[in-house]
Amino acid sequence: MDLTVPVNAIPFQLLAIIASNVQLKETIQLQPTRDTIEPTLKVNDKVTIIGTASVARYLIRSYNLINETDASSQNVSRWVDIILTQEPTLIQQLVKQQQQTKYLLNDTPQLVDALAWGVLHSAQLPTPHSWAVTEAALILGEEIAAGAATSTQLDTIPQLPGTSPETNVMDVFKNMIATQMNQISGVDTKLLFDALDLPRSLENGDLAIAVPRLRVKGNPAQFAQEWAKQFQPNDHILSAVAIGPFLNFRINAKLLVKKTVDMAAKFGLDYGKNKLDQGKRAIVEFSSPNIAKPFHAGHLRSTIIGAFIRNVYDANGWETIAMNYLGDWGKQYGLLAVGFARHGNEEALQADPIKHLYEVYVKINRDAEADPTIHDEARAYFKKMEEGEEEALSLWRRFRDLSIVKYKEVYARLNIHFDVYSGESQVGDGMERALKQLQECGILEDSDGAKIIDLTKYKLEKAIVQKRDGTTLYLTRDIGAALERYEKYKFDKMIYVVAAQQDLHLKQLFKTLELLKYDFADKVEHINFGMVQGMSTRKGTVVFLEDILDEAKEIMHDVMRKNEVKYNEVVEPEKVADEIGLSGVKIQDNSARRIKNYEFDRNRMFSFEGDTGPYIQYAHARLMSVERKSGLTINPNADVELLTEPEAIEVLRTVAQYPDLVRSLMNGLEPCNVVTFAFKLSHEISACFEALWVRGAAPEIADARLLMYYCARVTLGNAMRLLGLKPLERM
C-alpha cells in the first residue's frame, strides 16, 4: 500500500499507528508530496482512501489494532473517535484533565496515547512531560522530510504571480511548464505562462507554446527542437515534443482527472472562482432605461451583458456594485408632465406606470407636432424642476418611484439584482463643481449663449454642457455623477455598459474627465454592444420587454405540455416555462460577439434542437436526473482512475478548463465565450450519456461515473449562473 503524505502537514497520528505495528511498517510505502494537504492511502487499484481520519480508521480496523468485540476495548474505541474527530486544542484539554492515570487509560501507553500525541505534535501543541514521545513516529517523519528534500524540485507546484493552482487545476500544469521553460530558455515566466494554450488537436499534446509568441530572436522551429530536448519530464508533465515552431506538452491524464474532480467536488458553487483581484472594487452601470420610454430590446442587451460583467468581476475576486443609472431628468420630463395633465389616467398609472407613461409620452409628442408651443411649456416645466420647485418635483417623484417598483419586478424575473438605483436627478453639486473646474481650466467656451467643450482636435466634435437657458445636458450630469461616485466609492474600475450608438458620448465624457485631470480618469471603461433587429411580437408591433418575455414563456409552456408525463413531474411548471423562455432569450443574445448586431429569431431561440438556451437547460436537468435515478449518494472518494473511457476524459478535460475561462473573461468580457464553453460541455456530456451508464455498472465504476457527472453538473451550472441563467432540476 502507498501512503501519500503531505510534507507541509505531516499527520503524525498516522505515523504513530504505522510505527506501532511491524506488519504495517513493512506493508506501507510512504510517499512524500507537496501537491496535496490530505494524506491519501492507495490500498489497491480499486480502493483509495483520502483524509487523516478515514485512513486512520481503515488501518485500525484492517489490522485489528483495537479488538472492538472486547467490552474492555469500548472505552478505547470511544477515545479513538474523539481523537480523530475533535480539534487539537480540545484533545490537549482532555489530556491535561486526565490525572488519575499516567496515560489516558492507565499507566501503560496504548494506541490512543500515540494517536493523541500525534494530533498534538502535528498541531505543534505541547504534551505533558510525563508522556513518552512516540520516537518511531518522529523517525518516520524525519524520513518523509528527508525524502521530500532530496526529491526533484519539479514535484513542487510553483506559485507564480497572477495564478491560482489551489483553485485552478490547469495552473498546476502551466506553472510547472513555465517555471522549467524559464530555466531552459531564459524567457520571462509570465510570457511563457501566457503563451501556453490548448493545441488545435490533442493528438499533438495537451498544452502548447507557439514559440514565435515569445519574441525570441532566431529560428522558432530550432528553438522548439532544442528546448524539447532539454525539458525534463516529471510526474505532472510526461513529455515535451517539438512540431515545427510549436512546443507541445503531454500532461499526466490521471493526475489531471484526479485534481479536477477533487477541486470541482470540493468547491462546488465556487468552482471556477478565484481571489486574484480581492480587495478591488468595481462599479458596473448597466440597463439604465429612460422613464417614460419603453423598456425595449436595447435595454435588454445592456441588462443581460451588464449582469454578466458583474458576475465575471465577482468570480475574479472583485467587490462589485451593480448600478442602475436611470434616465430620469431632462426636458422630456417637462414634456411628460404637460402630457400627463392632458392625457394622464391615475388608474392606468398605478396598474402599469411604465406603459402608461410611454403612452402619454407618445400622445404628447404627437400633439407637439401640431402645436410647437407645447415644447416651450415643457422647457418651462423642466426649468421649474431644476430650480427645485416642489410642485413640479412631486409629480416627477411619483413617476420615478412607481416606475422603479415596476422595473424591480422585471429585473427579478430576469434573475438580476441592483445594489444602487441612481439617476441623472441624483447628481448633486458634483455637476456645478465640474462646470467650475472646466471654466478654471480654460476648457469651457461660450457658443451663442451655450457652454461647450471643443474636442474637435481629438476628433470628438464639440460637446454642449449647458444650454442657453442654463439647463444641463446628459454630458454635464455624467461628469458630475462620475466625480461623486469616485468620492463615495473610491472604485478601482467603473464600467459603463451602453450601446455602440453612444460611443461618441462616452468618448467625450472620458476625454473631459482626462482634461480635468481627475485621478479616476484612467479607471473608466465603456463596454459597448450592437443592436437587436426584428424584436417584435407575433402580432408585428414593437412592444415592451415584458411582452417578449411573456411570449417566450407561453411558447415554452406549450412545448412542455406536449409531454404530459414529464409535465406532471415538474414542480411549478409555469415558473419553469418562464425560466426556459428566459434562457432562450439570453443565450441567443449572448451567442455572438457583443459588438455584432443580431436578428431576433424566436423559432431558433426556443428550439430544443441545436445550440440554444433550452438545450443547455435540458443538459443540466438530465444530469440532475442521473443523480436522482442512480439511487446513490455522491462519493467524493470514488476511485476516478476507473474513468478510462475517452468520453469521461473529455468531459473532465473541459471541466478542468473552466477556471481558466473565468479568469480569461476579464480580457474582453465576451459572454459568447461562456456560451461556447457551455455548449461544448453539454455536447460532451450527451456523448457520455450514450456510453457511460451509472445504473447497472459495478459499484466502484458507478461511484466514479456519478462523481464525474456531478462535477460536470457543478461546472455547467456555474457557467449558466455566470450568464444569468437559473439551472433547472426538472423540465
How does the language model describe each region?
Residues 1-104, 121-122, 126:
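GST-like domain detector, emphasizing the conserved glutathione-binding G-site
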Residues 46, 103-105, 125-130, 393-397, ...:
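Active-site rim elements
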Residues 68-73, 101-112, 568-577:
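All-alpha amphipathic helical-bundle segments outside canonical DNA-binding/catalytic cores
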Residues 119-127, 584-590:
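Amphipathic C-terminal alpha-helical segment
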